[in-house]
Amino acid sequence: MQAQERIILALDVGSREQALALVKDLAPHVGAFKVGMQLFNSCGPSIVEEINQLGGRVFLDLKFHDIPNTVAAAGRVITRLNCFMFNVHAAGGREMMRQVVEEVKNEAKKLAVAAPLSLAVTVLTSISQEQLEEEIGVKGMKLKDLVVKWALMAKECGISGVVSSPQEIEAIRAACGPEFKIVTPGIRPAWSEKNDQKRITTPGQALQMGADFMVIGRPITQAANPVEAALKIIGELEE
């Protein structure tokens, strides 16, 4: 995989115009564009089609979590939209994950297209050990152990990989093997402003830990020259 293919640019912007301007400039320099709840709910499914038309691939970050039939039906729609990746909550359980994987595979075969990569979200990065125990009710298990348990469960269900914080990359890689995809959000090059993050993981560090893809937003989108910022990160990954 080439260095630029590892970069997923987070389109955390408020309008179609802002998003498509970034896609036009950066499609040759990144592997995919992350469309999250804000942009998707603002623009609808057409934003995925427009990004594809501009030569970009889409990671649809909607974190599906519902009964198996409902999530499987969503998987069919995502396949028709020609998404590159999408994600579901591992907490939805084995049957939900199995059904969406099967539905996506069948729909892709019917349409003669590549099936999108399916990713599981394990424990949200905003959840602390205390919240896991007191609010969610999971007691007697370390957060990292639960992340690895759910990653293994997702793999057994045919899910392609996980979205993981940098802190769990190495444990997931050791448990799930080299073919299981790991997508890591919140990556920031050392030269970028840290904003509200006290600790950062750089693209190079994430790659060394075992990440396949890294989600990067503000260090590129808010740079004076986004293309130059992307090229600088590509250079770091190639070192």
From Swiss-Prot:
SMART domains: OMPdecase (SM00934). Keywords: Decarboxylase, Lyase, Pyrimidine biosynthesis. Pfam families: OMPdecase. Substrate binds at residues 12, 34, 61-70, 125, 188, 197, 217-218. Its EC number is 4.1.1.23. Gene3D superfamilies: Aldolase class I (3.20.20.70). The active site is at K63 (proton donor). GO terms for molecular function: orotidine-5'-phosphate decarboxylase activity. Homodimer. Catalyzes the decarboxylation of orotidine 5'-monophosphate (OMP) to uridine 5'-monophosphate (UMP). The keyword Hydrolase does not apply. It catalyses: orotidine 5'-phosphate + H(+) = UMP + CO2. One of its GO terms (biological process) is 'de novo' UMP biosynthetic process. Pathway: Pyrimidine metabolism; UMP biosynthesis via de novo pathway; UMP from orotate: step 2/2. The gene is pyrF. Belongs to the OMP decarboxylase family. Type 1 subfamily. This is Orotidine 5'-phosphate decarboxylase.
